[in-house]
């Protein structure tokens, strides 16, 4: 927003009306979605739409065959996003589909991790980063049981461009907030109630 952009300044100062749709980063939308600041007791003043990665078409495809859905094409942090959505939503169908997907794909990844390194490199692009962690943990367990003088720097089976959050040592470093982009994803919110919006959204113009 430019300092001299009058339209942007006025837009920033105007209160939001009921039915307004806005796109906000997930970290901000999440706080607003769980905040109970509405006039109606027990009801938040906003509602949210599930992101496209959690849309009905994706859920139905996961229910049909979890292994056939390229999760990474929808979101590199698919399960991280799903965890946030499940904390905000009570969609039982989504929860069941995600549980089935994780179990089915995790077992396939575990089997795939036993194969040669060159057979795995072509498949990383379609799996979630959590599954990459599981595969690396599986490989580390196998390497730890073999007598070898090589360090993991030369034995790591995962291409660096597919696992930027991993380190070349004997331990797995957990994902850090800076490693993920989940918090920057946009979530659509709807202002549901007709009461004035809180001061955190707008300020009254001086009269």
From Swiss-Prot:
GO terms for cellular component: GINS complex. The keyword Nucleus applies. Gene3D superfamilies: 1.20.58.2050. GO terms for biological process: mitotic DNA replication initiation. The keyword Amino-acid biosynthesis does not apply. InterPro entries: GINS_A, GINS_bundle-like_dom_sf, GINS_Psf3, GINS_Psf3_sf, PSF3_N. Belongs to the GINS3/PSF3 family. The GINS complex plays an essential role in the initiation of DNA replication. This is DNA replication complex GINS protein PSF3. It comes from Chaetomium globosum (strain ATCC 6205 / CBS 148.51 / DSM 1962 / NBRC 6347 / NRRL 1970). The gene is PSF3.
């Amino acid at each position: 927003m430019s300092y001299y952009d009058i339209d942007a300044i006025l837009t920033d100062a105007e209160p939001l009306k009921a039915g307004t749709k806005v796109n906000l980063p997930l970290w901000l939308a999440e706080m607003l979605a769980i905040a109970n600041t509405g006039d109606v007791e027990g009801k938040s003043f906003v509602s949210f739409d599930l992101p496209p990665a959690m849309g009905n078409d994706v859920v139905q495809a996961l229910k049909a065959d979890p292994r056939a859905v390229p999760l990474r094409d929808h979101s590199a942090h698919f399960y991280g996003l799903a965890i946030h959505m499940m904390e905000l939503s009570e969609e039982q169908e989504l929860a069941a589909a995600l549980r089935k997907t994780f179990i089915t794909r995790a077992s396939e990844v575990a089997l795939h991790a036993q194969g040669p390194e060159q057979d795995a490199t072509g498949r990383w692009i379609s799996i979630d980063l959590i599954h990459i962690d599981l595969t690396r943990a599986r490989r580390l367990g196998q390497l730890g049981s073999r007598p070898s003088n090589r360090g993991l720097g030369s034995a790591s089976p995962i291409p660096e461009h597919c696992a930027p959050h991993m380190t070349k040592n004997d331990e797995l470093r957990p994902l850090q907030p800076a490693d993920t982009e989940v918090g920057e994803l946009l979530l659509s919110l709807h202002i549901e109630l007709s009461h004035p919006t809180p001061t955190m959204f707008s300020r009254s113009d001086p009269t």
